[in-house]
Amino acid sequence: TLKALEHLYPGALPQRGGIRVEFREDQLSGVTGVIANVVALLTGATHDTGFKGIGGRFDRRNLLYFSADVAEEIRYTRIDTGQSVDVAARLQSVPFAPQTFALMQKCLDGSATPQETAEFRDCWQARVRALLLQHGDDPEVFVLRPVGP
């Protein structure tokens, strides 16, 4: 989201509520809904439950869409200019710790010890931390594709 906003508002402060966001996946697919919550917080875009505006202005509802026909995972569009950028996350280039999936399986089937549960949580959070802090500016991980002319 940060990279998309930087692209759409170069050198300027993004306009909260001035962005339409479209997700390729359904809101219940994988972690799409979770990601959409973060995107909504940052952009002001909401589906139908957000800020309804004041005096008919500043309505932020109906700016967040799912199951959209977009090329990448998420499309961000400036309402005022129509400029759009598609964003994809290529997360496979940032590996999990080798034990992560075995620990996940134990957590899911209920056989994990408290220590294994804590280790799984730590492994998962370490990868999230690496994605955001070490690879947040990596164009091979977070790919932006301008849309249109």
Model regions: which residues?
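Non-transmembrane, aqueous-exposed alpha-helical and coiled segments at domain scale
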Residues: 1-149
